[in-house]
Amino acid sequence: MSKSKCSVGLMSSVVAPAKEPNAVGPKEVELILVKEQNGVQLTSSTLTNPRQSPVEAQDRETWGKKIDFLLSVIGFAVDLANVWRFPYLCYKNGGGAFLVPYLLFMVIAGMPLFYMELALGQFNREGAAGVWKICPILKGVGFTVILISLYVGFFYNVIIAWALHYLFSSFTTELPWIHCNNSWNSPNCSDAHPGDSSGDSSGLNDTFGTTPAAEYFERGVLHLHQSHGIDDLGPPRWQLTACLVLVIVLLYFSLWKGVKTSGKVVWITATMPYVVLTALLLRGVTLPGAIDGIRAYLSVDFYRLCEASVWIDAATQVCFSLGVGFGVLIAFSSYNKFTNNCYRDAIVTTSINSLTSFSSGFVVFSFLGYMAQKHSVPIGDVAKDGPGLIFIIYPEAIATLPLSSAWAVVFFIMLLTLGIDSAMGGMESVITGLIDEFQLLHRHRELFTLFIVLATFLLSLFCVTNGGIYVFTLLDHFAAGTSILFGVLIEAIGVAWFYGVGQFSDDIQQMTGQRPSLYWRLCWKLVSPCFLLFVVVVSIVTFRPPHYGAYIFPDWANALGWVIATSSMAMVPIYAAYKFCSLPGSFREKLAYAIAPEKDRELVDRGEVRQFTLRHWLKV
């Protein structure tokens, strides 16, 4: 913000507002004192009132209560992957030893990136695209994360529909996945648990038969046996379609009025999982074999830390478990009050996220230990990753308990609430990001929200066909893998290097009254970008084509997957080229306008571009 100039008259002092007279909100005032001594006018000036963010003048909706924001962030970050993936990775990678790289990466990269996104959204008061007025040429990364969130919505809502289907099926005296005497069961169905199943198998293709729970999921719910592959999808299943419709209706009426409605919904969806997890833990630890399961979960093998795969798994889990890079944290924090303490919010929410992930392992492995003892197999034979854990192994364990139907209802209500608030966050990222960018959409938020949820519903129909699990697997593998890591990397570089850690720290001090310490500035400037670059490179080097059980995807499906992945990443260079070409002036002038914040426009006009100085790039 530049100081306004005023002519000096013969009066002893002149007060000149630094903003237009009609500007709303706190103003920066330049007080110019003029004295006359021996016929010479002497002037001195001071600034009253600190600089305020220009966005504070905007009439923007805010959260009804601070707790609404915290519950929304926690509800989004704590999702289904925290329940099934973290405990499995911990068991797979040396038990308690896995916590060493996980906590290390959480402290040096996860928390700083989380804090950065909260501060970025809160200061600029806009969605994932609008915040890039701090560096216009990188605005494409905002559209990248918006597109990724949209892609994720195409298949994530299907998981919630599965949970809803299971919930309805649980309101019976006898759960439908207990026996092999149902219409969907095959001759291979066996009540005995297959002890030699492969690590990636869901249970359907085992040599000696499959469990009733596995057949219920793949034959009773998905009807996968009626499809030969991704090129043989078949029609949408009406039961799953009906469940998907209910999910879309829930999402729409949770989002249509903005954070005023979604902030109330999360009081249920974000707290219910903790109530259910506590109940399941109390029940799980009383089961025979539960202690063996928990012991396997916590067993420490520090020699595993010598393996690169353990560190890679920890790094990727940190990136995905916190939810950075989806634009959700930016969108949520943009509705905060300008002076909100986003630093404290970042510490609290990331800590709760990590503790929830760790605690859920006790719930999961108490039941896995019970299942392993019941079927006399090693825990490794029942410990699975992915949907198979929560839709096959866990329902099978619950079916053997007294009052199994009641426990099943409780469990799938938990899955439903875990999924709903995470899906709400993804949709809010898309909606806020676009309505802040296009004022026409802002004036018709309700209609635009309806359009977005209907679009996700129509494309989700491919995932509820007979072969829908193949579409689901393809989207899950490509939509938010390397592309989301790439988006976060560009975001971190844009904030820390182009905009500058110094300026970003000034913004935070302006909001909270406290400047980030050297630790956070070093993480933003050096550690986090290097960490993200490492994870991106590793994700590319270790890439493996997707598969579902024994099914291998054809080449055209893998090519389609890469089109999906690159379409979001391409937003960065495409928008950068568009922005650069649309700016006037010479090459140097174009570059100056492209990388300098919009609020520094007057400085650019005068040729004072701090991004062209070595001091800017070296400053921490």
From Swiss-Prot:
Q: Which residues bind chloride?
A: 317, 321, 357
Per the record, which residues fall in region Interaction with TGFB1I1?
561-590
A Gene Ontology biological process term: dopamine biosynthetic process
Q: Which residues lie on this side of the membrane: Cytoplasmic?
A: 1-56, 500-516, 584-620
Q: Which InterPro entries match?
A: Na/ntran_symport, Na/ntran_symport_dopamine, SNS_sf
Q: What is the effect of changing residue 79 to A?
A: Abolishes dopamine uptake
Keywords from the UniProt entry: Cell membrane, Cell projection, Disease variant, Disulfide bond, Dystonia, Glycoprotein, Membrane, Metal-binding, Neurodegeneration, Neurotransmitter transport, Parkinsonism, Sodium, Symport, Transmembrane, Transmembrane helix, Transport
The tissues in which it is expressed are:
Highly expressed in substantia nigra. Expressed in axonal varicosities in dopaminergic nerve terminals (at protein level). Expressed in the striatum (at protein level).
Recorded consequence of changing residue 544 to S? In a breast cancer sample; somatic mutation
Q: What topology does the record note for this protein and the membrane?
A: Multi-pass membrane protein
**Gene Ontology annotations for the cellular component aspect, listed alphabetically:** axon; axon terminus; cell surface; cytoplasm; dopaminergic synapse; flotillin complex; membrane; membrane raft
Record has Transmembrane helix as a keyword? yes
Q: Which reaction does it catalyse?
A: dopamine(out) + chloride(out) + Na(+)(out) = dopamine(in) + chloride(in) + Na(+)(in); dopamine(out) + chloride(out) + 2 Na(+)(out) = dopamine(in) + chloride(in) + 2 Na(+)(in); (R)-noradrenaline(out) + chloride(out) + Na(+)(out) = (R)-noradrenaline(in) + chloride(in) + Na(+)(in)
Q: Tell me, in a sentence or two, what this protein's role is.
A: Mediates sodium- and chloride-dependent transport of dopamine. Also mediates sodium- and chloride-dependent transport of norepinephrine (also known as noradrenaline). Regulator of light-dependent retinal hyaloid vessel regression, downstream of OPN5 signaling.
Family, per entry: Belongs to the sodium:neurotransmitter symporter (SNF) (TC 2.A.22) family. SLC6A3 subfamily.
What is this protein identified as? Answer: Sodium-dependent dopamine transporter
Q: Look up and give the organism this protein is from.
A: Homo sapiens
